[in-house]
């Protein structure tokens, strides 16, 4: 009986302990779950993420003329070549004559290819041709043909220039949003001039032996030179910019070359209208029998096309 009472008392104690300790632990679990649930953000009412900003072409890509482009120009220059007697002349008669006349409007073309982020390779070409009718002030030998003093000449010439220029952005650095850029120009140029002379009033003349007298002459002078210079462009407004450049090179008693230009450029869509002034000067080497030199200033207009504008 005593053992039965002890067993009953032990069972009652275990049950009482389970009630006092086990039930609160079970009651606390929903509270913890409720606390975890209240910390989760409500899915309703969340703002949608903002749209990605549109891609913008910066001023350094196209507005400053650095994108790939093709330009056609029309140059209204004036001036004419003149021939001088070179140091290599040993025949005792000069080779001096002023071509006279006005040049025809000169077509020109430029291809610009980006090299790196802000630099460009520019390949340009122009052609000037003209006619003149000078009268020789003295007896002369021109390209091996003898002319008399007072001879009336018909002169025709064609001058061409091809230039490859590496335009390197030198200031500012880093570029960021600068509207003003300065570039150093590293160039190589090929220049040639072909000239023909004729004395039309002496056609049909013969010498003492009855042989016809040659009264026409033809010659070509050319040279390849490096040239160095500076270029600048300024973004006046979103579609309007100013551009200028100048370069040249000379050796003492050798050939000389320089050119300069300044223009205002208005962009619309993939095109840009140009208007400005430019000048070009060259002189072939005076170490030869004869040399030719000329300076051509004038105004020009142009149309520039950016085929890849808007694709970036």
What is the predicted function of each stretch?
Residues 73-77, 126-128, 169, 187-191, ...:
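Outer-membrane beta-barrel pore domains and translocons
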Residues 240-255, 279:
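Transmembrane beta-strand segments that form the barrel wall of outer-membrane beta-barrel proteins
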Residues 29-124, 306-308:
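Short glycine/proline- and aromatic-enriched beta-strand/turn motifs that initiate or cap beta-hairpins
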Residues 260-312:
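Predominantly the C-terminal beta-signal and adjacent terminal strand-loop region
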Residues 80-105, 127-161, 192-223, 251, ...:
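Extracellular/periplasm-exposed beta-strand and loop segments of Gram-negative cell-envelope proteins
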Residues 66-68, 103-107, 158-162, 180, ...:
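Residues that define the transmembrane beta-barrel architecture of outer-membrane proteins
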Residues 72, 109-113, 164-168, 186-188, ...:
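Residues on the lipid-exposed face of transmembrane beta-strands in outer-membrane beta-barrel proteins
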Residues 58-66, 118, 171-181, 236-240, ...:
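Short loop/turn motifs that connect adjacent beta-strands in outer-membrane beta-barrel proteins
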């Amino acid at each position: 009986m005593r053992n039965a009472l002890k067993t009953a008392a032990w069972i009652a104690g275990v049950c009482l302990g389970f009630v006092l300790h086990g039930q609160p632990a079970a009651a606390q679990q929903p509270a913890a779950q409720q606390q975890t649930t209240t910390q989760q953000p409500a899915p309703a009412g969340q703002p949608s993420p903002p749209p990605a900003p549109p891609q913008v072409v910066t001023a350094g890509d196209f507005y400053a003329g650095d994108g790939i482009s093709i330009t056609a120009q029309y140059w209204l220059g004036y001036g004419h070549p003149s021939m001088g007697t070179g140091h290599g002349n040993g025949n005792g008669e000069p080779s001096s004559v002023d071509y006279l006349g006005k040049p025809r409007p000169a077509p020109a073309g430029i291809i610009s290819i980006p090299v790196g982020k802000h630099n460009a390779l520019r390949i340009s070409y122009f052609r000037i041709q003209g006619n003149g009718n000078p009268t020789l002030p003295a007896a002369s030998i021109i390209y091996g043909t003898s002319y008399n003093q007072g001879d009336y000449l018909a002169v025709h010439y064609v001058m061409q220039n091809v230039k490859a220029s590496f335009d390197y952005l030198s200031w500012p650095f880093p570029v960021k949003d600068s509207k003003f850029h300065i570039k150093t120009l590293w160039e190589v140029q090929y220049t040639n001039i072909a000239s023909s002379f004729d004395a039309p009033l002496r056609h049909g003349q013969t010498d003492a032996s009855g042989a016809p007298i040659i009264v026409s002459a033809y010659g070509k002078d050319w040279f390849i030179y490096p040239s160095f210079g500076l270029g600048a462009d300024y973004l006046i407004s979103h579609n309007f910019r100013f551009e200028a450049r100048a370069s040249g090179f000379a050796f003492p008693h050798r050939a000389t070359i320089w050119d300069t230009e300044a223009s205002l450029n208005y962009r619309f869509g993939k095109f840009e209208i140009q208007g400005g002034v430019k000048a070009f000067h060259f002189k072939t080497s005076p170490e030869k029998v004869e040399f030719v030199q000329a300076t051509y200033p004038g105004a020009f207009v142009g149309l520039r096309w950016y085929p890849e504008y808007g694709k970036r």
